[in-house]
């Protein structure tokens, strides 16, 4: 396997019935041509590959926007526990704090475009969120914010996004597979990458359309039901009444509290209850990303 580091995509030179050729360039501006059976485009929301194919959507800025910063010297409960805050003015967005090592956390918030706050207001809103009593208390009085914040758009429209073209398969943010309820996209990106590999293997020595159709079928099977479920729940969470009702249900017992987090961050698929083909023996029992607290 040949691995090229420090290179970037330039353009799609040609597509033929049996291969695709692309131009790439290195950090020292040295150009090179690469030929392969397929290109898997994992190049983000703004996908230069998609743009090269003339498939970009003018004016598209994503469904969500996220804002994040790291902090250290955390002494409150956020040091060891995952926190999710459903602030009334952020709904259906939310704020989060993920514990890291040595008293550090990843803390931030996300908003749905078209909500109460614009993307341009996120920077000014940040100090206000950090000063709110319950958030400040979770971090502790000695918390130190690190470096600068980062912000980025989140594409979450897998049911309408282009997934393939010719001998190109789009995955991850390039395929807009991000969860439309939480904005989480790492797991979705990994899964879409696996599905693209399965589709290519299934179409070996056959027309490109076989691989494209297989990939789109796999994406539909693995993402569409979850996307629709997330969109429905997002509508409910837009109101404070809906959010309170959902949290009351989640807070009924230690079991519901524990599995709400597993479900929200998709240790199990979002719509798993309605897609029996994805049930398995250890359903809701396997370990997630964070330690269980009863």
Show where each model-derived region lies:
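C-terminal helical "tail/cap" subdomain of flavin- and related membrane-associated enzymes
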Residues: 198-294
